[in-house]
């Protein structure tokens, strides 16, 4: 097959767009902030098809299962994996902050901090308890779940729908075939929308640099550097070890999903690459049923980057305000963060709201301390989203391997670049 010219390759276009966005934001900030609708529009186009794709993928995957106990088994294994890896992420964030101490030397008096700037985040954080979160998974109506784009609600509907179709067997085949055909159409739409990724990445990056400025990074470069370094270590060491035991290279896996990662980098939203990630995981040999269950669930329950960020941010605020936390208080922080992180989604700003929820339950550290990192949170959001999407991709491959539903030949060929993986191919075929 004839190789594409480099300027027609999507990830090259996205890289170029990000660079142009940074330049525009730095030299022409007023004009750059007007580019925000380009990024927002691209994310909305992707979110437009996320719900239907999750529904169709999960329904056809479950409907094709001969053993309905498998649904619970896959879900149980996924949740077990999520909890174990999330704990590693939380502990790594805590350890890195203790080791590198990015907050030491600020010597800030908590009484001088103005919490008005973060009041809206605190209000959102207080607005939902664990019970509310669980009840929110049940939609008011099926239509409402799709209209609001609530991933967990759509997943619940799909689980019920697919289970009934599996029970009906041949009598439900007409519906299953229709949904399978609809899946092909939806991924075709994703292929069209993905071509607009460079425009979306340009708009989002130009707005970020134009609004916040590169200069806002300087005072807190140590915290940003610590977070990025810790996330890289997590991916290469923790996820890399898991990948090695599963039989694949984390470096090759990251290279395989580079286009999705660049879209996430440009938009700061891991949701922006969800449909493409699901399709690529199927192309790499993961079964449709596992992809359909693990990836959407992971967007609420397996946010590794957010977990690293939370323990690091809390400890940074404590160091900056000279507040000493006992080991018992830090263990409490880990337990609280494990719970509050489950309500985070893959959209920009969700990590900051989750941080507010964590601080609200740990009264030793003032909530107003969040103002210290408010200005740089947008720059840390990219790293959170990148780590989250890699973590969910690895989780899907691992659970597929546990279920013995991983085609290792496809995985090997995909990671080596021997398979022509294009969005126009039909998922699950």
UniProtKB/Swiss-Prot annotation:
The record's principal subcellular location, in a coarse class, is membrane
The topology of this chain with respect to the membrane is:
Multi-pass membrane protein
Which GO molecular function annotations are given, in alphabetical order?
A: fumarate transmembrane transporter activity; malate:proton symporter activity; succinate transmembrane transporter activity
Task: Supply the Gene3D superfamilies for this chain.
Answer: Sodium:dicarboxylate symporter
InterPro entries xref list: C4_dicarb_transport, Na-dicarboxylate_symporter, Na-dicarboxylate_symporter_CS, Na:dicarbo_symporter_sf
Which subcellular locations apply to this protein? Answer: Cell inner membrane
Q: Name one GO cellular component term.
A: plasma membrane
- The record lists the membrane-crossing segments as 9-29, 45-65, 79-99, 149-169, 185-205, 223-243, 308-328, 356-376
> Would you kindly state one Gene Ontology biological process term found in this protein's UniProt entry?
L-aspartate transmembrane transport
Task: Look up the domain of life of the source.
Answer: Bacteria
What keywords sit in the KW lines? Cell inner membrane, Cell membrane, Membrane, Symport, Transmembrane, Transmembrane helix, Transport
Q: To which protein family does this belong? A: Belongs to the dicarboxylate/amino acid:cation symporter (DAACS) (TC 2.A.23) family.
Q: What does this protein do?
A: Responsible for the transport of dicarboxylates such as succinate, fumarate, and malate from the periplasm across the membrane.
Protein name (record): C4-dicarboxylate transport protein
Give the organism the record lists: Burkholderia vietnamiensis (strain G4 / LMG 22486) (Burkholderia cepacia (strain R1808))
């Amino acid at each position: 097959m004839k190789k594409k010219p480099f300027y027609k390759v999507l990830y090259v276009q996205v890289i170029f767009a990000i660079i142009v966005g940074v330049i525009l934001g730095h030299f022409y900030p007023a004009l750059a902030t007007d580019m925000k609708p380009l990024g927002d529009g691209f994310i909305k186009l992707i979110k437009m098809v996320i719900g239907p794709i999750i529904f169709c993928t999960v329904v056809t995957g479950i409907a094709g299962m001969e053993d309905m106990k498998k649904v619970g088994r896959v879900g149980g294994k996924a949740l077990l994996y999520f909890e174990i890896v999330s704990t590693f992420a939380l502990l790594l964030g805590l350890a890195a902050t203790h080791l590198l101490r990015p907050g030491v030397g600020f010597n800030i008096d908590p009484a001088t901090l103005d919490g008005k700037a973060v009041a809206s985040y605190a209000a959102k954080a207080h607005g939902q308890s664990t019970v509310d979160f669980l009840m929110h998974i049940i939609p008011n109506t099926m239509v409402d779940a799709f209209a609001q784009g609530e991933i967990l609600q759509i997943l619940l509907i799909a689980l019920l729908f697919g289970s009934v179709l599996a029970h009906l067997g041949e009598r439900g085949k007409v519906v299953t075939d229709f949904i399978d055909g609809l899946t092909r159409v939806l991924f075709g739409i994703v292929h069209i929308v993905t071509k607009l990724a460079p425009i979306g990445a340009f708009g989002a990056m130009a707005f970020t640099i134009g609004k916040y400025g590169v200069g806002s990074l300087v005072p807190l470069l140590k915290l940003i550097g610590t977070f990025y370094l810790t996330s890289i270590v997590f991916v290469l060491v923790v996820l890399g070890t898991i990948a090695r035991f599963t039989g694949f290279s984390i470096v090759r896996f990251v290279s395989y999903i580079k286009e999705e990662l660049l879209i996430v980098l440009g938009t700061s939203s891991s949701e922006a690459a969800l449909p493409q990630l699901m399709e690529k995981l199927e192309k790499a040999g993961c079964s449709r049923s596992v992809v359909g269950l693990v990836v959407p669930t992971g967007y609420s329950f397996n946010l590794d980057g957010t977990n690293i960020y939370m323990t690091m941010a809390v400890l940074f605020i404590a160091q900056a305000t000279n507040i000493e936390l006992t080991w018992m208080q830090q263990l409490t922080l880990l337990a609280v963060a494990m719970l509050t992180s489950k309500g985070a989604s893959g959209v920009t700003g969700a990590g900051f709201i989750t941080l507010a929820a964590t601080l609200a339950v740990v009264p030793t550290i003032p909530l107003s301390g969040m103002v210290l990192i408010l200005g740089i949170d947008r720059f840390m959001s990219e790293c959170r989203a990148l780590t989250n999407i890699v973590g969910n991709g690895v989780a899907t491959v691992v659970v597929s391997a546990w279920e013995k539903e991983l085609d290792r030949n496809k995985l090997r060929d995909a990671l080596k670049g021997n398979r022509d993986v294009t969005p126009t191919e039909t998922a699950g075929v």
